[in-house]
Design a protein with these regions (language model features):
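N-terminal beta-alpha lobe that positions the nucleotide/phosphoryl donor
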Residues: 1-269, 273-290
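Mobile cofactor-carrier "swinging-arm" domains
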Residues: 32, 525-528
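Broad, structure-driven detector of short, well-ordered beta-strand segments within folded domains
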Residues: 204-210, 507-509, 527
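Hydrophobic residues embedded in beta-strands of well-ordered beta-sheets
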Residues: 216-217, 278, 516-518, 527
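Catalytic cores of soluble metabolic enzymes centered on carboxylation/carboxyl-transfer
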Residues: 254, 292-515, 520-526
Length: 528
């Protein structure tokens, strides 16, 4: 049973089917007609649209597993993937949890406990506290002892939530109170830890795999430095300009930590790197969104490895058998408006098409899908692989520009700008680079020539009328143009969706006038 939704549910199902493993899924009321439900085939309705009424219901997910005769549950990512209580409930029901043991999930889910584990394993940790505190006075004392700038972190947090930068002692008490309140609301615990802020660092993470018996290997590193407000935007593998000796040290530390934990399944050890010094951040005890870039450079299927480990086969590879080839970059296409502070965009997807060819596309949407406010805004991931980093970046930017999505606003132009940004091309970025240059990266592109768009649309219409003469909506003698409505007399049929040079436009036509002129509507503008 796949206890997730969207692109990752479909991705896990494809690997299962390739291995001859039967699959079933779950869905909320909002996802009854979702792409992943049809891709999987057998799917159990587990509740209402809100995640708390469906995908986060441990009892409903386990009941679905029993109803389908499942032997194991793969949590995907998000929702219950890092929930120790869920993992325990799965095992208590006599099922296999495809992931780490509940005890390991619990230890890694608390940032303070995870930091203590890293310290015991001899992995460098960021200066600051190692135990959480809900005492405002104690947190303030730790901040002053550590020295500014610092990061306040919700000990029970994750995914970039419950984090607050403190760069001045002015208003410190208010900052602490706000961070505690946010942590309590988001995670049920107000406990904070304090860490020295690494202001211009790089986010490097190591993919590990363990058999749960002390044997752990790594699949090299990923660079996830390009973030907006602690949320990853572009990921790549391997990291650019990373000295081999430094890479080896980081990988060795990640493996050592995994062995100490008797880690089982796939996990990601995250570090913050500044110059040649690096520090432990956290361990994500699950499949990562960005796992495809690692699969691209190693030729391995991480989901397959997770399944084999869970079935008791152990690690099918030794470290010496794993090699890194080429370069891979991933971009997350999201339904959000960069021009409006990345406000999520919801609604019906009128049309979507992704580039064909040598581009890996992982998506949970199609034409006709509905983007609701209940879940994450990510629509798709595009992954480009090439012999060199420059080639991979070029290929990915071309794929982003070639993707057409109508009906909701997306971050495609922002991604295209980012992939062509000098700091990205030279790999001179740090984790605050996007936030410091957000105005430049979200600047609206120059407007396309409206007259050129109108002329191109007219040629398209004339051609359609010639090749579809038997269609009453398109023929020369009878077209849909008589269905004009509105001030400009624009017909609702046909409607042309056009993308060009990074711009998107919805085009409609008015009837041809007696003098041969015609008005063409381009979004909210009109050209005659």
């Amino acid at each position: 049973l796949i206890a997730s939704r969207g692109e990752v549910a479909g991705r896990i199902a494809r690997t299962c089917r390739r291995l001859g493993v039967a699959v079933a899924g779950v869905h909320s009321s909002a996802d009854a007609d979702a792409l992943h439900v049809r891709e999987i085939g057998e799917s159990i309705a587990i509740g209402g649209a809100a995640a708390s009424d469906s995908y986060l219901r441990i009892d409903a997910v386990i009941d679905a597993a029993k109803a389908t005769g499942a032997q194991a549950i793969h949590p995907g990512f998000g929702f219950l993937a890092e929930n120790a209580a869920f993992a325990r409930a799965v095992e208590a029901a006599g099922l296999i949890f495809i992931g780490p043991t509940p005890d390991v999930i619990e230890r890694l889910g608390d940032k303070a406990l995870a930091k203590q584990e890293a310290d015991v394993a001899g992995v460098p940790i960021i200066p600051g506290s190692t135990t959480p505190s809900e005492d405002k006075a104690e947190v303030e004392r730790i901040v002053r002892d550590t020295g500014l700038p610092v990061m306040l972190k919700a000990a029970a947090g994750g995914g970039g939530k419950g984090m607050r930068v403190v760069s001045t002692f002015d208003g410190l008490a208010d900052d602490i109170e706000s961070a505690m309140r946010e942590a309590k609301n988001a995670f049920g615990s107000a406990g904070l830890i304090v860490e020295k802020l690494i202001p211009r660092g790089r986010h490097i993470e190591i993919q590990i795999l363990g058999d749960g018996k002390g044997n752990v290997i790594h699949l090299f590193e990923r660079e996830c430095t390009l973030q907006r407000r602690h949320q990853k935007v572009i990921e790549e593998a391997p990291a650019a300009n990373l000295p081999a000796a430094l890479r080896d040290r980081m990988a060795a530390d990640a493996v050592r930590l995994g062995k100490q934990l008797n880690y089982r399944g796939a996990g990601t050890v995250e570090f913050i790197l500044q110059d040649d010094a690096y520090y432990f951040l956290e361990v994500n005890p699950r499949l990562q969104v960005e796992h495809p870039v690692t699969e691209s450079i190693t030729g391995l299927d991480i989901v397959e490895l997770m399944l084999r480990i869970a079935s008791g086969e152990g690690l099918p590879l030794t470290q010496a058998q794993i090699a890194c080839h080429g370069h891979a970059v991933e971009a997350r296409i999201c339904a959000e408006d960069p021009a409006n502070n990345f406000l999520p965009s919801t609604g019906d997807i009128v049309h979507v098409s992704f580039p064909a060819g040598d581009i890996r596309v992982e998506t949970g949407v199609e034409s006709g899908s509905v983007v609701t406010p209940y879940y994450d805004s990510m629509l798709a991931k595009l992954i480009a692989f090439a012999p060199t980093r420059d080639e991979a970046l070029d290929k990915l930017r071309g794929a982003v520009d070639a993707t057409s999505i109508f009906g909701v606003t997306t971050n495609q132009a922002f991604l295209s700008n980012l992939l062509n940004w000098p700091e990205t091309r030279k790999a001179t970025f740090h984790t605050r680079s996007i936030d410091e240059s957000i105005g430049q990266l979200t600047a609206a592109p120059s407007e396309s020539n409206r007259e050129a768009l109108a002329l191109g649309a007219c040629f398209w219409m004339m051609r359609q009328r010639k090749i579809a003469a038997r269609d009453p909506w398109q023929s020369r003698d009878l077209t849909g143009w008589h269905m004009a409505a509105g001030d400009a007399g624009l017909s609702p049929i046909p409607e042309l969706h056009l993308t060009t040079a990074g711009h998107s436009a919805t085009i409609r036509f008015a009837p041809v006038q007696a003098n041969g002129a015609m008005t063409v509507g381009i979004n909210d503008d009109h050209v005659t």
